C-alpha cells in the first residue's frame, strides 16, 4: 500500500493526523495517529479460527513505551513487559469502544495492538489510541458494522474542552472518555466533581459532535484505500434453526420465567439447553451445535424481553424501576479500621477500609513520572462468589476495571491531605454476585470509609442501569441482575451523592443509543441512587468522629527544605535511627512536610523530639540538658542537640576548682549547660557553672 494520510481539525492546536503505508505494511491494517508531538501506532490483524466458537476472540493490548518520553523504566528490568494498571485500563477502553462494531457470529481471531511511540507531556494518548485502532480495523479486511472514533471531554473554567491537554485535565471538573459512531454513542467512562445529569448529557452531546466528524473522515478514507472485507468470516444463523429452537423451548422457558427465582431459572435453562442439544443437533447440517446454541441464547433473550415489554415484569418479578432488597451491617469485622457488609439482592460485598502512613501509598510509574496514590480501591472477585471453581492469582482486567471505577466514584468525596493525612486503602471482597458488583463496591466502600472515621464530604452510592431495546421501544431497567446484563443491550453504571454524579461507565451491545435513552437512564439512576443513599444514611448518617483505636496515629511537621538532608542523613542513616529509637514510621517529602505515624502517642512525641533536635538551631544564652559525649583532660564535650556538640572547659564545670574532669563527669552523663558563645568557626562554648547561678 502506498503512503496515505488525512487530518481532522478538532480545535486550535488539536489536529488529528492519520497515516498508513509507511510502517508495518504486512499487518492487515496499520495506522499512525499524531496530535502535536504525541504519536500512537495501532495495528489490526485477524486469523481464521481452527473451529467455530460462540464468542468473539477479540484482544486489545495498549502499551506506553518509556522511550516515547525520553525515559527508561525505574525498575530493575528496563524492558517493557507486564502491563501497568493504566495500560490495562486503556486497553479496556479501546476494547469496549470497538467490540460493539463487529458483526454477530464473526469467526475470526482479532488482535489490536497500540503503542505510544512519542509523548510530548501535553497531549494525552488514550483518545488517539481509540481512533488509531478504529482506523486500522476500518482499512483492514476485518468485517465491521460501523466506524468508531473516540475523544476525551473536559470542563475547564465552565467551558467544554475536546481532548484537553494534561494541564487542562488537571484543572478540569470532568474527565470523560467516550466513543461512538457518527450517529450514536457506544461507550462512555468518566468521573467528575458532582456534575448534574444535565451537565453529563451536555458533555456527551459536545463530544459526539467531534466523534461524528472523525468517523466521517475515517469512513471516507476507508472507501478510498480500505481492503475488501472478508464477509465470509461472518456466519449466518438460518431462520428455520431459530424458529425450531424457539418453538421447542417456548412453553417450558415461559413457565421457568414465572418462577421469579434465579436458581430455579438457571436449573431449567441448563436442562432445556441439554434437551435442545440432544434433540435438535445434527452435525453436517444447519442444525450444528454452534447454531443450535446461538439460537437457544437468542430464544431466551427474546422471551425475557417479551416479558418486560408486554407485562413490565422482570425475570425476578420486579418492575422496571424497582431495586432489589438491601441490607447493611457496618463494623462487621472487629479488628479492621472500618468495614461494611453490603448486600443487594444476590450481590454482596465485604468492604474493608485500612488507614496508614505515607509508606502505605500505592506507588506507580508512567510517562509523566513517578507518583504515589494516597487513596486506592482494590476489587476482589473470587470464583466462589458465583458458585464456580477458578483461578486465584493476580487480578484480571475485569477486576482492575471494576476497582478503578469504584475508586473514582469515591475519590471525589475524600478530604484533603492537610485535613486528613492518612493513606486510605479500601478493598471490596465480592462474596456473592448477581450483577452490579462494582456498584456494591461503591456503596460498601463508602460505608467502610465512614466506619473508619474518614471525614468524607458526603455519602456515595452507585447503581447499574440496563436497557431492553425492542421493536423501536426502549425500556430502561434499574439495578440490573446478571441475566439482564448478559441478555440485555446496555450496562450503564452511575455513582454519586445527593448533590451530583462522581463516576459513570456505559457499555452497550447494540450499535448505539440515543440522547433520549441516556437522558431517561440518568434520570432513573438518580431516583435509584437517592433510594440507596436513604437506606445507607439510615444505618450511618455521618462518619465516626474519630479513627479506629486500632488505626495508627498520624501527625505532621513542617521543616525548612534546607533541613531535609539533615533529617535523612547520609544514606538515610539519620532517619533510620529516628525510626528505630521512636518506633514510629517517618516519611518526608520534597517540600519538607513530615508525616509521623505510630500506634502510640509516645512514639510520635519521641520522633518529633528527635526531629526537632536535628532541625532546631542552638541559641546563645539558652540552657540545654546535654549528653556528655567524651571526656578530655581540659574539659568535656557535650551534645546539646542531635549533631550539635560543644566544649565545656574544665574551668566552666563548677564554681569550685576541678582538678580531674573524670572525677566530675563521665561519658554518657546528662549535664545541664548554658551556651555562652559561638565562634567564627561555629564552635560552641558551654558552661555548667553558669547554670548554677
UniProtKB/Swiss-Prot annotation:
Entries under Gene3D superfamilies matching the protein: GHMP Kinase, N-terminal domain, K Homology domain, type 1, Nucleic acid-binding proteins
Quote the record's binding site residues for Mg(2+).
485, 491
User: Which CDD domains did the record assign?
Assistant: KH-I_PNPase (cd02393), RNase_PH_PNPase_1 (cd11363), RNase_PH_PNPase_2 (cd11364), S1_PNPase (cd04472)
What's an example of a GO molecular-function annotation for this chain? RNA binding
UniProt keyword Ribonucleoprotein, yes or no: no
Under Enzyme Commission nomenclature, its number is: 2.7.7.8
The record, for Pfam families, names: KH_1, PNPase, RNase_PH, RNase_PH_C, S1
> Could you say which cofactors this protein requires?
Mg(2+)
A Gene Ontology biological process in which this protein takes part is:
mRNA catabolic process
What Gene Ontology cellular component terms go with this record? cytosol
Can you give the residue ranges of the S1 motif domain? Answer: 621-689
Q: Which SMART domains match?
A: KH (SM00322), S1 (SM00316)
Instruction: Read off the InterPro entries from this record.
Output: ExoRNase_PH_dom1, ExoRNase_PH_dom2, ExoRNase_PH_dom2_sf, KH_dom, KH_dom_type_1, KH_dom_type_1_sf, NA-bd_OB-fold, PNPase
Give the UniProt subcellular location, in the record's own words: Cytoplasm
Q: Which family does it belong to?
A: Belongs to the polyribonucleotide nucleotidyltransferase family.
PANTHER family in the cross-refs:
POLYRIBONUCLEOTIDE NUCLEOTIDYLTRANSFERASE, POLYRIBONUCLEOTIDE NUCLEOTIDYLTRANSFERASE 1, MITOCHONDRIAL
Query: What job does this protein perform?
Result: Involved in mRNA degradation. Catalyzes the phosphorolysis of single-stranded polyribonucleotides processively in the 3'- to 5'-direction.
Please name the NCBIfam families in this protein's record: polynuc_phos, PRK11824.1
Q: Per its record, how is this protein called by name? A: Polyribonucleotide nucleotidyltransferase
Amino acid at each position: 500500500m502506498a503512503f496515505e494520510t488525512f487530518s481532522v481539525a478538532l480545535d486550535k492546536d488539536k489536529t488529528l493526523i492519520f497515516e498508513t503505508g509507511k510502517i508495518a505494511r504486512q499487518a492487515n491494517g496499520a495506522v499512525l495517529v499524531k496530535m502535536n508531538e504525541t504519536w500512537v501506532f495501532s495495528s489490526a490483524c485477524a486469523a481464521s479460527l481452527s473451529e467455530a466458537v460462540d464468542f468473539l476472540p477479540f484482544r486489545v493490548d495498549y502499551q506506553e513505551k518509556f522511550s516515547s518520553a525520553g525515559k527508561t523504566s525505574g525498575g530493575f528490568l528496563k524492558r517493557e513487559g507486564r502491563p501497568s494498571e493504566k495500560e490495562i485500563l486503556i486497553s479496556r477502553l479501546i476494547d469496549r469502544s470497538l467490540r460493539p462494531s463487529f458483526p454477530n457470529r464473526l469467526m475470526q481471531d482479532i488482535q489490536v495492538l497500540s503503542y505510544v511511540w512519542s509523548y510530548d507531556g501535553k497531549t494525552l494518548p488514550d483518545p488517539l489510541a481509540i481512533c488509531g485502532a478504529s482506523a486500522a480495523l476500518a482499512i483492514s479486511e476485518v468485517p465491521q458494522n460501523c466506524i468508531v472514533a473516540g475523544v476525551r471531554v473536559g470542563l475547564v473554567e465552565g467551558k467544554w474542552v475536546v481532548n484537553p491537554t494534561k494541564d487542562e485535565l488537571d484543572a478540569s471538573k470532568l474527565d470523560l472518555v467516550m466513543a461512538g459512531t457518527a450517529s450514536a454513542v457506544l461507550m462512555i467512562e468518566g468521573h467528575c466533581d458532582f456534575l448534574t445529569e444535565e451537565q453529563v448529557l451536555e458533555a456527551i452531546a459536545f463530544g459526539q459532535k467531534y466523534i461524528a466528524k472523525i468517523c466521517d473522515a475515517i469512513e471516507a478514507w476507508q472507501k478510498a484505500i480500505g481492503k475488501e472485507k472478508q464477509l465470509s468470516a461472518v456466519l449466518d444463523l438460518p431462520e428455520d434453526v431459530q424458529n425450531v429452537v424457539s418453538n421447542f423451548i417456548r412453553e417450558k422457558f415461559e413457565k421457568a420465567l414465572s418462577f421469579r427465582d434465579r436458581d430455579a431459572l438457571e436449573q431449567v435453562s441448563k436442562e432445556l439447553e441439554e434437551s435442545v442439544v440432544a434433540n435438535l443437533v445434527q452435525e453436517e447440517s444447519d442444525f450444528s451445535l454452534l447454531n443450535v446454541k446461538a439460537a437457544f441464547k437468542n430464544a431466551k433473550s427474546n422471551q425475557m424481553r417479551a416479558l418486560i415489554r408486554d407485562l413490565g415484569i422482570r425475570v425476578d418479578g420486579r418492575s422496571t424501576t424497582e431495586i432489589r432488597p438491601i441490607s447493611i451491617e457496618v463494623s462487621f469485622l472487629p479488628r479492621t479500621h472500618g468495614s461494611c457488609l453490603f448486600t443487594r439482592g444476590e450481590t454482596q460485598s465485604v468492604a474493608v477500609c485500612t488507614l496508614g502512613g505515607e509508606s502505605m501509598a500505592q506507588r506507580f510509574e508512567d510517562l509523566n513520572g513517578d507518583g504515589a496514590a494516597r487513596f486506592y480501591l482494590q476489587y476482589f472477585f473470587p470464583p466462589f462468589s458465583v458458585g464456580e471453581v477458578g483461578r486465584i492469582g493476580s487480578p484480571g482486567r475485569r477486576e482492575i476495571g471494576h476497582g478503578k471505577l469504584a475508586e473514582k466514584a469515591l475519590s471525589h468525596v475524600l478530604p484533603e491531605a492537610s485535613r486528613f493525612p492518612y493513606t486510605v486503602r479500601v478493598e471490596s471482597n465480592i462474596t456473592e454476585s448477581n450483577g452490579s458488583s462494582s456498584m456494591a463496591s461503591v456503596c460498601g466502600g463508602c460505608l467502610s470509609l465512614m466506619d473508619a472515621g474518614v471525614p468524607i464530604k458526603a455519602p456515595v452510592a452507585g447503581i447499574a442501569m440496563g436497557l431492553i431495546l425492542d421493536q423501536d421501544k426502549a425500556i430502561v431497567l434499574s439495578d440490573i441482575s446478571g441475566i439482564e446484563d448478559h441478555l440485555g443491550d446496555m450496562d450503564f453504571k452511575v455513582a454519586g451523592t445527593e448533590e451530583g454524579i462522581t463516576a459513570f461507565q456505559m457499555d452497550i451491545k447494540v450499535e448505539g443509543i440515543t440522547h433520549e435513552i441516556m437522558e431517561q437512564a440518568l434520570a432513573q439512576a438518580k431516583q435509584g441512587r437517592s433510594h440507596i443513599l436513604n437506606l445507607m444514611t439510615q444505618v450511618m448518617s455521618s462518619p465516626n468522629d474519630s479513627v479506629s483505636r486500632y488505626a495508627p496515629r498520624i501527625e505532621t511537621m513542617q521543616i525548612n527544605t534546607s533541613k531535609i538532608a539533615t533529617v535523612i542523613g547520609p544514606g538515610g542513616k539519620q532517619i533510620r535511627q529516628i525510626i528505630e529509637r521512636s518506633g514510629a514510621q517517618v516519611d518526608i517529602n520534597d517540600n519538607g512536610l513530615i508525616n509521623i505515624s505510630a500506634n502510640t502517642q509516645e512514639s510520635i512525641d519521641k520522633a518529633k523530639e528527635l526531629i526537632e533536635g536535628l532541625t532546631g538551631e542552638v541559641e546563645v544564652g539558652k540552657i540545654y540538658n546535654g549528653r556528655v559525649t567524651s571526656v578530655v583532660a581540659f574539659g568535656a564535650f557535650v551534645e546539646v542537640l542531635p549533631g550539635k556538640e560543644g566544649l565545656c572547659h574544665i574551668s566552666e564545670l563548677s564554681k569550685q576548682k576541678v582538678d580531674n574532669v573524670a572525677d566530675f563527669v563521665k561519658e554518657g552523663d546528662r549535664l545541664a549547660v548554658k551556651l555562652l558563645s559561638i565562634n567564627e568557626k561555629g564552635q560552641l562554648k558551654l558552661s555548667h557553672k553558669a547554670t548554677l547561678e
